[in-house]
Design a protein with these regions (language model features):
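Short alpha-helical scaffold segments that flank and stabilize functional sites
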Residues: 7, 46-47, 136
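Short, amphipathic C-terminal "tail helix"
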Residues: 124-141
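N-terminal strand-loop-strand
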Residues: 1-29
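Unchanged
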Residues: 1, 32-123
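Residue-level signal for alpha-helical context at structural boundaries
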Residues: 28, 62, 129-133
Length: 141
């Protein structure tokens, strides 16, 4: 899972896609599987380009972190990326056959309101998106 932040503008790149287990559209950060022979950084760069069309550079990558250790062995790497909007020339996406993804550029200070609107629309919001908003000072009042 990556946290792509733009420059200029300090906006988050967020996607919305249908997630069958939830039965609804879900807002989330771009993410994807690591292919055989790939490391987490390479996978993050590839997935961001495939899902959003944006190219980014990796600022940091965590080791494995477990998403729900009480229920499963699933893990992710959290990858923070910078996307230079002025350097983007080819925003073509390359979705998997089952994917239909919309991309949103959201100012970080507007994220709590963005999440509230998403929920009012009946959409789901991924935990990691909420956590980013909380750690940036949202939802604390």
């Amino acid at each position: 899972m990556m946290i792509p932040v733009t420059k200029p503008g300090d906006k988050l790149i967020i996607i919305r896609q249908f997630r069958p287990p939830t039965g609804r559209l879900v807002y989330e950060f771009p993410a994807g599987l690591i292919n055989p022979g790939e490391d987490p950084v390479e996978a993050a760069v590839r997935e961001l380009k495939e899902e959003t069309g944006y190219a980014g550079t990796v600022d940091f990558c965590t080791p494995r972190v477990f998403t729900s250790p009480g229920l499963s062995s699933e893990f992710v790497h959290l990858v923070r990326m910078t996307v230079d909007l002025d350097a983007q020339t080819d925003l073509q996406t390359h979705f998997d056959e089952s994917e239909s993804i919309e991309t949103f550029l959201v100012p970080q200070d507007s994220l709590p309101d963005f999440i509230r609107r998403a929920e009012a629309e009946g959409c789901g919001v991924d935990t990691k998106l909420y956590m980013w908003a909380i750690t940036r000072g949202g939802f604390l009042d």
